[in-house]
């Protein structure tokens, strides 16, 4: 497996260098981002999934302890939600809730995004990862609050619809600010002339 991964990495670097030499910016961005995500995911998935799960659980638990609505047991990756009618409800924080995929996608796109310099990418990468983690914690908090208020019957609505919708909206906002807005500002717009005057 390691040999195959190394071989694929060498091929990826070689093809990427061809795109760079030919100045094919779009293919460099696309091929580079996808390749970086795949390699990082294969390498980091077994290493960071559990630590990230515990970290997200601990961060969410701070809010739970402050409000008294739920408690975090990071060793097991579980949030225990207090509900008067149904009793304690457990919410297991799995791989999806860890935020590893979302962070790797963001960092991979940012690495090959040509509108930033390297020192800018490092700073934005740190802020972006913190933003994704915060959005994830907020999503879990909203899910816990909904279950606390209305019981286990709203689990599907809270987790699958409301929680994901909130997380995706925050992620789209981050992507717009980092990528789309920057690209628009980088565009050169010619001057317009109206009634003989430049505007």
Where are these regions (language model features)?
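Hydrophobic N-terminal alpha-helices or hydrophobic patches in metabolic proteins across all domains
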Residues: 1-199
């Amino acid at each position: 497996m390691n040999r195959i991964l190394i071989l694929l990495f060498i091929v990826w670097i070689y093809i990427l260098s061809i795109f760079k030499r030919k100045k094919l910016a779009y293919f460099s961005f696309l091929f580079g981002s996808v390749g970086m995500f795949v390699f990082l995911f294969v390498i980091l998935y077994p290493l960071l999934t559990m630590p990230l799960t515990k970290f997200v659980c601990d961060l969410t638990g701070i809010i739970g302890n402050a409000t008294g609505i739920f408690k975090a047991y990071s060793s097991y990756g579980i949030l225990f939600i207090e509900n008067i009618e149904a009793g304690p409800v457990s919410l297991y924080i799995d791989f999806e809730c860890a935020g590893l995929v979302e962070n790797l996608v963001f960092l991979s796109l940012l690495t090959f995004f040509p509108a930033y310099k390297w020192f800018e990418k490092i700073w934005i990468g740190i802020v972006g990862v913190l933003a994704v983690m915060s959005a994830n914690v907020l999503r879990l908090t909203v899910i816990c609050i909904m279950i606390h208020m209305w019981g286990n019957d709203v689990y599907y609505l809270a987790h699958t619809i409301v929680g994901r919708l909130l997380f995706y909206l925050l992620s789209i906002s981050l992507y717009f600010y980092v990528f789309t807005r920057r690209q628009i500002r980088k565009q050169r717009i010619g001057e317009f002339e109206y009634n003989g005057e430049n505007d």
